[in-house]
């Protein structure tokens, strides 16, 4: 077994501004205290393109990468402030049928099952964490599958804390929904919801919401930009967190990465557009944050949100903790 360790010095960055977010009848006062630690991956044989991370109900962590299609057990340690101080990745197991894993979500009702979204095959499948064997396939709507764009397919994935709702979304606009995001206007993605009656019961497609993504903030870097929705997290109160990321050129020499965290409530009617509220946003230098995992409240008012960066291309691999304090 390989054990790759990333030890992070306690580096305090800043207190991000406190916001009062009104969503339906629920008021959320969110103050994010961000502590950033960055570590380059020096072992070329290690997983340097982590694209998704999840925390199981039994406190186990897993991550996926979009290069090898593997699931990696992880160990995450926090200091007293809630910032990540240790991140260990062990030998991964190949995921049957996956080659471009983007998102992952541990099943709250089955301890050894993790769901994975695969961009290349436009699929959501469940896997045994020990063997990688596919044990279930979630049936996606045909209109969704037949209209995805290359490298902009299904990306974000999460499951509600009670294990009865699964959410999945594409990264950028479907062909049937218009054009992709540009520096002039944002795009539109579909957030699909599936429901089930209990552990092991089949997932049933139960509707979708229209989610507007941000316009790109810069010009193409080396003739390309990256923009869209990359991760979701269910807060368990009827609302979700959405992570958007962007890569563009804002200076002559280097690419610029930007991350933004929004909160929204799914639309009441199928195909309705959601109203999103910005909680946090930052230019994150060379960190391409693609995956996030929400930790339980643990009896307190604070929630830890762990973000991982895909270290492929121009980006570096890093880990960041956002602490959401709800009063």
Please give the residue ranges for each predicted region.
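Sequence/structural signature of beta-propeller domains
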Residues: 27-327
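N-terminal secretory signal peptides that target proteins for export/translocation
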Residues: 1-8
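Bacterial N-terminal signal peptides
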Residues: 12-24
């Amino acid at each position: 077994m390989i054990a790759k360790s990333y030890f992070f010095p306690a580096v305090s960055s800043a207190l991000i501004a406190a916001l009062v977010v009104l969503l339906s009848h629920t008021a959320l006062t969110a103050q994010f205290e961000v502590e950033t630690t960055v570590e380059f991956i020096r072992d070329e044989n290690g997983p340097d393109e982590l694209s998704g991370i999840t925390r199981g109900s039994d406190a186990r962590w897993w991550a996926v990468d979009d290069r090898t299609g593997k699931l990696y057990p992880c160990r995450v340690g926090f200091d007293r402030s809630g910032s990540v101080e240790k991140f260990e990745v062990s030998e991964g197991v190949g995921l049957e049928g996956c080659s471009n894993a983007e998102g992952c979500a541990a099943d709250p009702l089955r301890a050894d099952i993790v769901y994975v979204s695969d961009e290349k095959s436009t699929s959501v499948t469940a896997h045994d964490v020990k063997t990688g064997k596919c044990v279930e396939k979630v049936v996606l709507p045909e209109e969704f599958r037949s209209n995805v764009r290359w490298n902009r397919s299904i990306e974000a994935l999460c499951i509600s804390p009670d294990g009865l709702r699964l959410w999945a979304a594409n990264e950028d606009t479907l062909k049937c929904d218009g054009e992709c995001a540009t520096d002039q206007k944002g795009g539109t993605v579909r957030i699909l919801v599936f429901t089930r009656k209990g552990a092991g019961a089949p997932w049933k497609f139960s509707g979708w919401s229209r989610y507007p993504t941000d316009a790109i903030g810069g010009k193409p870097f080396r003739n390309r930009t990256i923009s869209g929705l990359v991760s979701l997290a269910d807060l368990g109160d009827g609302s979700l967190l959405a992570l958007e990321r962007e890569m563009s050129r804002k200076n002559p020499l280097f690419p610029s990465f930007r991350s933004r965290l929004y909160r929204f409530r799914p639309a009441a009617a199928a195909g309705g557009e959601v109203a999103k509220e910005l909680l946090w946003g930052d230019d994150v230098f060379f960190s391409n944050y693609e995956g996030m995992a929400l930790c339980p409240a643990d009896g307190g008012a604070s929630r830890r949100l762990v973000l991982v960066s895909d270290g492929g291309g121009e980006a570096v691999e890093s880990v960041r903790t956002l602490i959401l304090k709800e009063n």
